[in-house]
């Protein structure tokens, strides 16, 4: 996700336009109920928008529009869909500074990160999936006798997509780009904490020339909008990114209604293994960036760090120095590299975990406290003396907190790393290619990074093992998430009987 280096620092432009309505059938409209909800800047706790609140009636209208649009959009030429998505990518890139400023305001992340990571990778996702649009190939399996068999892939239909608050624009791009490229239509619900960039993206989709109803965007709450999408009998597929607990609920709702297709990208408690031969300066930088990037609100954050006992003290010293050097503050202030947590609820949750860790007997190496009286800021935090049955070691905190533990033997530490309900990501810092290749195979995670972390590329699949999810985003594998195979059997009418 994070590029090797961020572009030069620059001031975030002032946000001058915020779309506050729902997008249904090509028009921006208020909610049927007339309800709105407040969107708060997590850096200063001030209200920045009052956004229309979608509920069941709005979901019904959006699904109806998506179903109607699907009947024609599914039959469109794949090269036309490719060019349409390339146009959308160009529009997003042209407006990248505006979108980054809006994301920073909405989510709290540093403007430079929003610009060079969230927006830049979103553009790449749209361009990559545009390239897939005309490369979805069927097959002609061998058949016995005078028969012909063709297997083709076709779009699933109306796709519900529920987007998280940690990467609002980027996660929308992860899901929206393959869905539209394959010829599906979409009802998308952004997180209630961070709806602004998704709705602005909807304006760009309309500007690019997508037909009415192909994309519908419904800001709202999970209980009254997200659950209605997941339960809707005319939604064919649901894609969700968020916590494992809510993922269970989404899957249950899909099963209890029309057995709609489900793809889930869920939680993680990712382990980073620092080997005895690792470059400790590099390893400490990898760990620092990946623990505190996006204020730790990343499902792949290296929140469990296992360090060989021979280099443990030096590594912890380097990690502490790096953590204490982080510049924490509002995302739109130049030079800050860690913003606030996204909401009051998340702020209280993270501080609660830190308090629980202290009570359980873990040692705070650095950090552990909130910062200031305004905004949802928490110090970068490191725990040592952690036992693996502690909540801070087992549960996903989703904040700038990590646990650093010793190990003696690689086989032993891989077992410890795998002892989790999660399997989203893992990492190894080592100078040995043999070690990297061997143990990356043994780690039960959908992604393993070696001497790096959160290094995403649209051509590589992303998803989790175990309770970290079902299915994959990105890569060629994403085609399977938004198409269905159809077998067609032909009997020859020119069979000559003896």
Swiss-Prot record:
Pfam families: Aldedh. Gene3D superfamilies: Aldehyde Dehydrogenase, Chain A, domain 1, Aldehyde Dehydrogenase, Chain A, domain 2. The keyword Lipid biosynthesis does not apply. Keywords: Mitochondrion, NAD, Oxidoreductase, RNA-binding, Transit peptide. NAD(+) binds at residues 242-247. The active site is at residues 265, 299. It comes from the Eukaryota. It is found in: Mitochondrion. GO terms for biological process: ethanol catabolic process. One of its GO terms (molecular function) is aldehyde dehydrogenase (NAD+) activity. Residues 1-9 form a transit peptide. It catalyses: an aldehyde + NAD(+) + H2O = a carboxylate + NADH + 2 H(+). Its main location: mitochondrion. The record marks 166 as: Transition state stabilizer. Pathway: Alcohol metabolism; ethanol degradation; acetate from ethanol: step 2/2. InterPro entries: Ald_DH/histidinol_DH, Ald_DH_C, Ald_DH_CS_CYS, Ald_DH_CS_GLU, Ald_DH_N, Aldehyde_DH_dom. It is an enzyme of class 1 (oxidoreductase). GO terms for cellular component: mitochondrion. Its EC number is 1.2.1.3. Belongs to the aldehyde dehydrogenase family. Could have an RNA-binding activity in addition of its catalytic role. This is Aldehyde dehydrogenase, mitochondrial. It comes from Leishmania tarentolae.
């Amino acid at each position: 996700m994070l590029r090797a280096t961020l572009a030069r620092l620059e001031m975030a432009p002032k946000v001058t336009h915020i779309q506050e309505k729902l997008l249904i059938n090509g028009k921006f409209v208020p909610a049927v109920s007339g309800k709105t909800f407040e969107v708060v800047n997590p850096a200063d706790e001030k209200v920045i928008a009052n956004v229309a609140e979608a509920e069941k009636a709005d979901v019904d209208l959006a699904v109806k529009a998506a179903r109607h649009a699907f009947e024609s959009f599914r039959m469109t030429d794949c090269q036309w869909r490719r060019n349409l998505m390339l146009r959308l990518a160009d529009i997003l890139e042209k407006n990248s500074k505006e979108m980054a400023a809006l994301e920073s305001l909405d989510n709290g992340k540093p403007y430079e990160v929003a610009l060079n990571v969230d927006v830049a990778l979103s553009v790449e996702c749209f361009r990559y999936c545009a390239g897939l649009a005309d490369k979805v190939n069927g097959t002609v399996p061998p058949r016995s006798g005078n028969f012909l068999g063709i297997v083709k892939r076709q779009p699933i239909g109306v796709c519900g997509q529920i987007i998280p608050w940690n990467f609002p624009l980027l996660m929308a791009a992860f899901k929206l780009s393959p869905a539209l490229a394959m010829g599906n239509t979409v009802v998308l619900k952004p997180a209630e904490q961070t709806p602004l960039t998704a709705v602005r993206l909807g304006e760009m989709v309309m500007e690019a020339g997508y037909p009415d109803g192909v994309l519908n965007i419904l800001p709202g709450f999970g209980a009254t909008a997200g659950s209605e999408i997941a339960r809707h009998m005319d939604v064919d597929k649901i894609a969700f990114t968020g916590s494992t607990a809510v993922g269970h609920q989404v899957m249950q709702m899909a099963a209890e209604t029309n057995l709609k297709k489900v793809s889930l990208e869920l939680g993680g408690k990712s382990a980073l293994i620092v080997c005895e031969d690792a470059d400790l300066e590099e390893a400490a930088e990898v760990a620092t960036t990946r623990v505190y990037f996006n204020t730790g609100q990343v499902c792949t954050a290296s929140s469990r760090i296992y360090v060989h006992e021979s280099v443990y003290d030096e590594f912890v010293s380097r990690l502490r120095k790096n953590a204490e050097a982080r510049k924490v503050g509002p995302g739109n202030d130049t030079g800050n590299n860690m913003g606030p947590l996204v909401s009051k609820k998340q702020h209280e949750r993270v501080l609660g975990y830190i308090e629980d860790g202290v009570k359980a007997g873990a040692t705070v190496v650095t950090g552990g406290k909130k910062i200031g009286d305004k905004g949802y800021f928490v110090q970068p935090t490191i725990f040592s003396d952690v036992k693996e049955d502690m909540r801070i070691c087992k549960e996903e905190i989703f904040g700038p907190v990590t646990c650093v533990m010793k190990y003696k033997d690689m086989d032993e530490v891989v077992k410890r790393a795998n002892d989790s309900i999660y399997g989203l990501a893992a990492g190894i810092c080592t100078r040995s290619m043999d070690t990297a290749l061997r143990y990356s195979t043994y780690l039960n995670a959908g992604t393993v990074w070696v001497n790096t972390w959160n290094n995403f590329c649209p051509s590589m699949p992303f998803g989790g093992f175990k309770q970290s999810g079902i299915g994959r985003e990105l890569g060629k594998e994403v085609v399977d998430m938004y198409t269905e195979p159809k077998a067609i059997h032909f009997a020859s009418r020119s069979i000559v009987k003896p």
